[in-house]
Design a protein with these regions (language model features):
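"…centered on the first transmembrane helix and the immediately adjacent amphipathic helix/loop
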Residues: 1-58, 74
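Short helix-capping/hinge motifs at transmembrane helix termini and TM-loop junctions
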Residues: 32-33, 65, 89, 117
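Membrane-helix interface segments
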Residues: 13-14, 65-71, 95-96
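Hydrophobic faces of alpha-helical transmembrane segments in multi-pass integral membrane proteins
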Residues: 56, 73-80, 100, 104-108
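Membrane-embedded catalytic cores of phosphoryl/pyrophosphoryl-handling enzymes
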Residues: 61-64, 68-85
């Protein structure tokens, strides 16, 4: 059984809007020239990657549920951003370790989602 919380249509729309804003923020911060984007010190570049994709995946799961197209799309987004960074030449470099951090954030969100669903089902 797949966990999907019972949300009102309005709550789903807000979740979808938050997902879209997070997606746009990730695209901007990932593809803008390196000197044009702020980089808060959260413990390193890989932590920022994992955190960004954790939040994006969590919002996507909230708004749309655990659909394969959502999870596959986020995976492709992470890979596509790294490829684009390697090709753009704007002071950014594509990095396989960044992709692993992106996927780690996505996997952590999915695991937490499943654990939450099991906990809710046990109640």
């Amino acid at each position: 059984m797949v966990f999907r919380p019972q949300l009102s249509p309005l709550a789903r729309r807000y979740g979808a809007a938050a997902f879209a804003l997070c997606l746009l923020a990730i695209l901007f911060l990932s593809l803008a020239p390196a000197d044009a984007t702020p980089a808060p010190d959260l413990g390193g570049d890989k932590v920022r990657h994992a955190l960004a994709y954790f939040v994006l995946t969590g919002l996507g799961l909230y708004a749309f549920g655990p659909r394969p197209v959502l999870l596959g799309g986020i995976l492709l987004l992470g890979a596509g951003v790294e490829i684009a960074q390697a090709l753009m030449g704007l002071g950014r470099e594509g990095d396989l370790v960044d992709l692993v951090a992106n996927l780690s954030g996505e996997a952590a969100a999915l695991l937490l989602w499943r654990a939450w669903g099991r906990w809710r089902g046990a109640r």
